[in-house]
Amino acid sequence: MKISVVMAVYNGEKYIEEQLMSILSQSIMPDELIIQDDGSSDSTTDKIQSITEKSDVSVKLIKNKENLGFSKNFITAISAASGEYIFLSDQDDIWKKDRIKRALSVMEDNENILALSSAFDLIDEDGVVIKKADNSKKLVNISQKEFIKHPKFPGMAMVFKKELWEYLQHNGKVDWESGIAHDWAINYVALKKRGMYKLEESLLCYRQHSFNTFGTAMAGGFNQKDKRIKLIKSLMDNARGIKAESQSEEKLLEGIVSFNEKRINFYEHDRLLRLLLHEFAHMKYISLRSIMGDIYTNLRGRNR
């Protein structure tokens, strides 16, 4: 059994050392670490080389000649991985010591799992815990309804089987040029195969700071409307990036796009009441938590 860790980096000098040390001190070590740098202009790659040259883990540092962007950087890095199990990593988080050990144990005990997300604690820029995750250790098979309403399964908390990635690369279901997020695509296809799961156990700490959108949302909502709109547009890109295999799937994906187009329109014109009426009338596409986030962001924007 071979284990790969894939990390995409860009100007991550502030936290990269702490993240790498947490990966290279796991109770079960990875067999290879694939790091793809997207044209950093700071000391990120120097710090990576300084730390990894002392490790017994096989490290492949790829330096892009041109900037690919976050998702494409990850997509090409994943394709370079050879492990049976592929863990994704951001450049600024902290893995708990047994992350690999615990995730592999769950996947080996449940062969139908294709992609596994774990819970995570939220920390601030200084590593102080802001919010602790549910640690019930419950294993949940994610339904299509849950995934579509609130796709809260970021790549940095994921591990998946290489066979799933190979299927994604060769079956033509995903249009990688559409702007689709790599983690959303992986989870969606695993979901279609009934192999998407979440372990309600915190296996890492996710760092929330001014440069990562997901962390800001987890901390209690976006403080800028344009960031919220950017997030909603990404949901549309994700749906557009999937090639439907049936009429029902086509209807679902078109519904996601149409719902979020109107959502953005109401957002941009500060029509909060119409936004809420629209959202409550289409609860199949949005969770109550996301609606509350929309209210928070809209009202906060008006008070600025």
What positions do the PLM features span?
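Glycine-rich, basic loop-to-helix element that forms the pyrophosphate-binding segment
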Residues: 64-81
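Flexible acidic/His/Gly-enriched loops in nucleotide-sugar-dependent glycosyltransferase catalytic domains
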Residues: 72, 100-173
